Amino acid sequence: MLEIDNQTPLESDFLLLEKIANVLAPTQIIELVLVSDETIREINKDLRGCDYATDVLSFPLEAIPHTPLGSVVINAPLAQTNALKLGHSLENEIALLFIHGVLHLLGYDHEKDKGEQRQKESELIKAFNLPLSLIERTQD
């Protein structure tokens, strides 16, 4: 199940994200928060010590029954900019970032694993007919 908190004026169709959430975590709640550049920069600085805006952040919650799996926070203006730059829809860019974030909630870590997150992202991108993700675009 997907809970959405859109704190931006950007409008998007979230049906695809609901389908992705149901595939990745069919019995769990995932919170999606769409925020501004300034807000994600503040979150990144406060919680990670990184004083810059980024595209997506993931925050897993403790394994407490009846609580969400975690939160995926997406920089909506940056997603819109990247979608235009890369020639695909805002919905597709948000879906790519959402997949990336949810995989982190599920324990994947592309900075430490041996390609497992990249492989899982690729499988999901093909299954949902999405363009290349950031992790695939930066692949060697």
Curated annotation (Swiss-Prot):
Gene Ontology terms, MF aspect: metalloendopeptidase activity; RNA endonuclease activity; zinc ion binding
Protein name: Endoribonuclease YbeY
Main location: cytoplasm
Cofactor note (record): Binds 1 zinc ion.
Superkingdom assignment: Bacteria
Binding site for Zn(2+): H100, H104, H110
UniProt-annotated location(s): Cytoplasm
Keywords: Cytoplasm, Endonuclease, Hydrolase, Metal-binding, Nuclease, Ribosome biogenesis, rRNA processing, Zinc
Annotated EC: 3.1.-.-
InterPro entries: MetalPrtase_cat_dom_sf_prd, YbeY, YbeY_CS
Cofactors that this protein relies on: Zn(2+)
One Pfam family named in its UniProt record: YbeY
One cellular component term from this protein's GO annotations in UniProt: cytoplasm
Similarity annotation: Belongs to the endoribonuclease YbeY family.
Gene Ontology process terms (BP): rRNA processing
